[in-house]
Amino acid sequence: SAIISDTLLFRSPTCTPMDRAAAVSLAEMAGIKLDEFANQMFEAGSELKGKSDAEILYLDFKKFSAGKTNFGVGQINSLNAEELGKLKNRMLPFMEKAREDEGLDMIFFMLTNILTETTELLCVGQGAAQVVADAFHVGDANEELKQTATLPGVVSRKKQLIPALTVTLEQ
């Protein structure tokens, strides 16, 4: 389950050939089908009913610094597009409060759809929308990014999101 979770069932750029081989071997030993097990695991892990905004944001949240900017990034992985869609409007006001409470310049929150390998990135803080527009060449901050951007193919905070944000913030 750790390999499946870390690699998003081999979809993440963090996945290595050794990860895949180990998972296949372990699944054979355990007598399970990887796809079925992964779906059950992701469904259980993305069950957000009854969780507060704080629990959702801080479930997988890390702080970073780049240039003179301190920022935080949270992430939720789900198979359920409807569940992710509902989070968008719910989380933005809380993210602004969390940004102030944490003393951060910006907060980004990745709503990652495992099936479509797409992230809807929410952002708050002065200049955050421009950073996303510049880092991922999406939208035009002059027409207002509206605090969200769709990032096809982006599923990894570590390998995809943080490097792009860091390069942009350090310019």
Where do the PLM segments sit?
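Internal alpha/beta core interface subdomains
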Residues: 1-2
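Active-site histidine-anchored catalytic micro-motif
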Residues: 9-11
